[in-house]
């Protein structure tokens, strides 16, 4: 019987779809799957459903005798050696679109949380308490009417821009290509990175990672930002040099930061945890019931298509 190996628990809606068609084995151990377990799991599998946290390198691919598809449960796919998979005639798919609204919502949530000191205020209210309303007490920054600078105006970046416009924000964006139709639809302005850094009150990273973007935001870039600026990263951790971010916060080069992704994920740079003006969330960009269920359906449906001889919908290689 055709076999599918799943590298970790996924929502039942996708799991049940796969079980209707194939023999399914799923890793259900504690923590992330280790390399040897994954190699054993894929040895006789026709399909691998990998998680964004699953490293699928050449060694893993070479361990699989029958593999036809790697269906990645995530919009990104930098955890997979995509080119080598193609050389072995293995399709790699992802789950685009499903993450868009959830991640855009979180991006705006991070902006509001750090600018209005919501997390800090929650902690104060639960611990020492406060003496009541006062004119100079616990002031933050307004979001409405400010300028947002979006690095990466893809689907998620575009959704962030639409939400920002509802706050009457001016929208700047940068990326490898100008997107004139989106500019007109959203009311965004294309600028180079330096111009964005110098003018934005909130700089949001919503780009997918590739090696050319490694440490795109480093000491030089922080020094170009406003002293009242906030950095928001809901894209990929390695785009930001976290040590440079720590130094920028220490030296009050910028006013604060909010991160959902990390350079050394799942590890978080310890120094970041000490700043009250930093909000940290555990990579929950698309962690909604709706998004995660949709992602499960996509990986299941693309796996079913491939193993039934049809072309998957979301091939990335």
From Swiss-Prot:
InterPro entries per UniProt: D-2-hydroxyacid_DH, D-isomer_2_OHA_DH_cat_dom, D-isomer_DH_CS, D-isomer_DH_NAD-bd, NAD(P)-bd_dom_sf
Alphabetical keyword list: NAD, Oxidoreductase
Entry EC no(s): 1.1.1.-
Binding site for NAD(+): 155-156, 234-236, 260, 283-286
Active site per the UniProt annotation: 236, 265, 283 (proton donor)
Pfam (any one): 2-Hacid_dh
CDD domains: 2-Hacid_dh_13 (cd12178)
GO molecular function: NAD binding; oxidoreductase activity, acting on the CH-OH group of donors, NAD or NADP as acceptor
Similarity-based family: Belongs to the D-isomer specific 2-hydroxyacid dehydrogenase family.
Name listed for the protein in its UniProt record: Putative 2-hydroxyacid dehydrogenase SE_1879
Lineage, broadest ranks: Bacteria, Bacillati, Bacillota, Bacilli, Bacillales
